[in-house]
Amino acid sequence: MTNDEAHTARMGQRTLNVGFIALTAAIGGLLLGFDATVISGVVPFIREYFALNGAGGDLRLGWAVSSLGWGALAGNAFAGVLSDRLGRRKVLLCAATLFVLSASLASLATTLTAFVAARIVGGLAVGAAILIAPVYIAEIAPAQRRGGLVSLNQLMIVIGISASFFSNYFLLDVGEHNWRWMLGVQVFPALLYLLLLSLIPESPRWLVLKGRDPAALEVLTRVYGAEQAQASLQQIRQSLAARKLAHGWRALFDRRIRFVMLIALALAFFQQITGINAIFYYLPTIFAQAGGGVSDAFRQAVIVGLVNVVMTVVAIWLIDRLGRKPLLAIGVAGMAVSLLTIAWAFSVAPHDPALVGVAPANARLVLIAIIGFVASFAISLGPVMWVLLAEIFPNEYRGVAISAAGFWNALVSASVTFVFPWELSTLGAAGVFLVYGLFASAALLFVLLFVRETKGRTLEELEGELLSRPKSTAA
């Protein structure tokens, strides 16, 4: 008996609730959202503690902030392949362990090197969780609920983001070690994640890929019921019957997935090049640039976090009703308008390279436009991109292909957040947000021309439709 079959047997005959399974997997999203954006509150304090002012200070600060992203690159590079070999659940267990380790070490760091190393460890967990959690959910969810359940992962990410803004705000006045508490509090939800992962099964599609059909049928039966389980198992078998399991990175060069691979890479690029993580990671700094005190900047970050949560809930409600492509088009258009508005608001204010208040009269417009940008992102590129990535690739390519797209996504994110302090002090906020707005405009054009609708179709049905470039992209 394999470890996965033994785990399935230990779970007994109780019925498994697919909502509970998806929610458990999505806690990884909460942890990565918290871990990624908690740095926004830490920035002002580590800048002073690690003496990141003066010559080269902006780039060293960028390195400290983006180190999580560089770690995520390694997590992205290996998570998909490891999940194809070891299983989706085992990779999520590893990610949970790394979240605990990273939070502990970062909160105790006394040097910049130790801090960066701890954040890189957290990046490994982020890179794994952001890829494998939605894949796992997509592979266990019924087709009619898949979009909403996969989007649950994005909801947990934004709840984690909002929780980090709340946590930072409430820990702001605990004393000189407030930034250590901001980082260390994540240990508790990470330990809970480890516990809950022991209660859920392995992905049935992965079990079939490994020839473990009885274990897959056991999981499908307790999730879907006996009748639907047999039909689902047959669909999975048929999708794999005539194909050899793809191994390693060479699978990415298969001509059959070239078109969907290009779509995935483009969406991953646009999600980050439009500046979402730069905004989240430096949100109090941006609000301070628009005018206002430290406490006000942290309070405004909380407001943005709440808007992010609310609009992600709206996206989850709409994604299986309105569809993936309409949400993308509407949201990306809103992102472009909001970013260009932010650029204009800063353009009429005097530029201050020292990152101090510049134009209190524009602070309200900047806040409104950032809220508009985050709301638009939350109904489009935030959740919808990951849903599409979990849907458009064939079973035997899914792990490695999503890993490649995630690696590219993390590379762009890390690069954007690394250079942001330097850009802000060199180009000014107006120039930075103008560039982001132009990229968002290009993203809108791409969505309208190339993205296909996947709503309501099983993963196996989508394979035949998307393996080669479609004649029309209007659907």
Q: What do the PLM-derived regions correspond to, one by one?
A:
Residues 229-240:
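Short, well-structured alpha-helical segments
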